[in-house]
Each structure stands twice: as structure tokens, then as C-alpha cells.
Amino acid sequence: QWAGMAGTGLAVTDNGSSAIFHNASTIGFSQEAMGVSYSYSKINKAFALQSASLFYRIGREGKHGFTLGFRHFKEPELGMIGNNQNVDFRPRIWDLGVGYFRNVSQNLSLSLTLRYLQAKAFEDMDSKRTVCLDFGATYHRNMAILDEMASWSVGFQAANLGRKLDGQKLPARLGLGGAIDLPFTMENRLQVALDLNYLLPSEIRHLQAGVGAEYNFLKYGVIRGGYHFGDNDKGAGNYGTLGCGINYWPIRADFSYSLADKDCFMYRTWQLGIGIVF
């Protein structure tokens, strides 16, 4: 979902399975009690990202719960010479996260996520490790339109707060997002989201933004689109996104493709995901 909407997800409350990667506190306002998901992304033809996650809301009212997430990122192969023979090695990094979320009031949810990261840059080097924290908050309210079924949300996340990895500071991120959900009928629904993110430290310091929309039609079909504004030298750059999906309860399948120039990191990037919710 988030990939088809230009990476927006800080305030989107209907995708609990992958919320740990954006803002785990949004799960507090999810309509589902639990869910699992898996996605595969091919980035710029040479990079690969795999993600798996789950969430579970505890108790009848589901006011609190936990979420788990795993991501594995591979870079292009490096042609190296070692022990008198050529070695093809792909640098990689993976992280494992566990988060806890809780509704502290009817309209406010908070979350805290602990993540363990491990990276390996060269075949003959030891892996480097570190830990970091993500903090999230979401404020959600219904609107006095569409029989009070419409709603709006504001989400905040402070991510990658932790120790250095192999002597390098983690790319910390401060994000603020908003979303409006408009269910016109049981079969037709529009959702619009906007995210603003500020990345630091100084080497990658810049502001990036994304705006995305999702339309559910005929109960099961989904189409998405969005545009991401960024810095080509310090981040993902400027690119558009298109996406589609099928929601046939309890199964959810999604596909997205990035529309980017050749000098953009997101050039020829696509993602395929599948999930199950209950």
C-alpha cells in the first residue's frame, strides 16, 4: 500500500501488518485484530528488499498489542579477489524489530519499537551490529460527514534513534503525516495521505515529502497513485508511483511501480506484497 502511495504511511490506519516500518502507533486504530504480510521489492534493477511483519491486538477491545518486523536489504554484487580467486559478494543489511503500541485515550495511540540491525559490507569482514529505537504517535478522529464514518488522522514518528553502525551515524528521521479516509459506500472508498520527513545527520540532511491517494472500488479492487519529493544526491529523489491491489478478505495482494528518471534511485523499482488479516 505505502509503496503505491509514494511512501506515505505515517498516518494511514488500515495497514497494520506493515505499520512497524512506518508508525506502529497507527495499529491502535486498525479495524483488524491481527495480520501478517510479506513483500519483495526490486529497486533500480540491482537492489533487493524483502520484508515480513505481523501484528496482534490484545483483548476484546484491542487497546494495546505488539508487532514484529523483519527486513533484509541486498546491494549489487561486488567483484572482488580473495584467496587467489574471484569472489562475487552482495553487501547486505537486515533488521529485526519488535514494537508495542497502546491507546492512551479514545483518540491517541503511542508506540515504541526496538530494532536490532546487522550489516556486512565485505565477505572477509565481520558483521557490524547496533540497536535503535523508533517512537510513534497517532491522533485519530471521526468526521461529521458520511454518517460519521469518515475520519482523519495525524501521525508522528522519530525513527533510527540509536548508536552508530560501523562508526557511521544512523540516518535518523523525524516524520509528520496526515490522512483522510472517506468511505462513500460499503464498496467505494477514498483515502488521501501526506507525509513530511526530515532526515539527518548533516551528510544526508534534507527534507522529503510524499502525497498519495488510494481508491477502493467494487468492494475488492484498489488503485493507488502518488508523488515523492526528495533529493537525488542525499535520498531517493523525485518520482511518481502507481499501484493496484485486491482485498478479498482475509487475503490482501498489492503491486506498485515507480515512475522515475534514470538518474533517480527509484528507477525501474517495483514491489509485490501479500498479506492476511483477521
Residue ranges and their predicted role:
Residues Q1-F278:
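Subset of outer-membrane beta-barrel
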